[in-house]
Amino acid sequence: MTEDDFSALYKVLSDSDIMKYYPCVFDENRVRNWIFRNIERYRVFGFGLWAVCLKETGDVIGDCGLTMQLIDGEIKPEIGYHIRADKQRKGYAKEAAIAVRDWTFNNTPFNVILLLYEIYK
């Protein structure tokens, strides 16, 4: 994820359906801060949320990665993702989450990762 991904990530993070678990949808300033926070996570932790790109075109359709979250009173690693609405339910989040899982187990000391998601009929 870089500043060059702003326009693509704005389409994702400003969507109220995608951001329903956040206090608000992101405006332009919040998206810029989101990008900068992830760049800082790369520096501090060596990981964060990465841009999810289509293999065929390179188009950014969201983000997915590993972040440290306060869960049940403890800081724990969690896989998180946001995928553009028109690309949802096509396996991109699953593929990205599996890649993050594999990367995490091969490159960090973590042996447990959390992932929260909704199950649809």
Summary of predicted features, one role per range:
Residues 1-20, 53-121:
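Acyl-donor (CoA/ACP) binding surface of acyl/acetyltransferases
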Residues 17-37:
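Conserved GNAT-fold acetyl-CoA-binding loop/helix
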Residues 26-30, 48, 75, 120:
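Short, conserved alpha-helical segments within structured domains
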Residues 38-51:
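A short helix-loop-beta-strand connector motif used in the catalytic cores of GNAT acetyltransferases and
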